[in-house]
């Protein structure tokens, strides 16, 4: 009898965990879709509305750390200028208890990073934290060498 009760409790808790995970995916997908739509609008003022005033936004591959919305706005404006046709596509995302992760694809034409005029596409991931409905911490991870090879700065493998 005790083992049946334990099994029922385990199944119920597992179901609650799956429901919470699915709810997190829906919330994560919604936030990321909106934030990426802002990036895709190429409007830095729109981009920063999805981030807290004290956000720490880190582009790990490029070595850029931006503290606060003003620095993030400057970074976004520079990136949009360098890749004027940038496109971010959410592959998958999940937010749970204020922590999130998203897989994405970034594509565009290099007009200012290395000024080659060549197109690139790279998969990446963001690890982020949410506070008060805004992103308060974001770390982007991707393979910069992939971009460099695609735009001709590094030799193809």
List the predicted regions and their residue ranges:
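Short beta-strand segments enriched in hydrophobic/aromatic residues
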Residues: 51, 106-108, 126, 142
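A short hydrophobic beta-strand element
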Residues: 97-108
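Short, cysteine-centered beta-strand-loop-beta hairpins and adjacent loop/turn segments enriched
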Residues: 81-82, 108-119
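A solvent-exposed, acidic/Ser-Thr-rich amphipathic alpha-helical stretch
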Residues: 29-30, 44-97
């Amino acid at each position: 009898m005790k083992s049946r009760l334990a099994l029922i409790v385990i199944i119920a808790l597992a179901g609650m965990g799956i429901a919470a995970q699915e709810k997190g995916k829906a919330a994560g997908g919604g936030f990321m879709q909106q934030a990426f739509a802002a990036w895709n609008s190429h409007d830095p003022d729109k981009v920063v509305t999805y981030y807290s005033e004290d956000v720490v936004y880190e582009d790990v591959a490029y070595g850029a750390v931006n503290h606060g919305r003003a620095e993030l706005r400057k970074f976004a404006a520079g990136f949009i200028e360098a890749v004027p046709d940038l496109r971010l596509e959410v592959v998958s995302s999940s937010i749970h208890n204020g922590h999130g992760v998203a897989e994405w694809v970034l594509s565009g034409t290099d007009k200012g990073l290395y000024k080659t005029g060549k197109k690139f596409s790279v998969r990446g991931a963001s690890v982020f934290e949410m506070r008060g409905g805004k992103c308060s911490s974001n770390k982007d991870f991707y393979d910069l060498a992939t971009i460099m090879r695609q735009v001709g700065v590094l030799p193809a493998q």
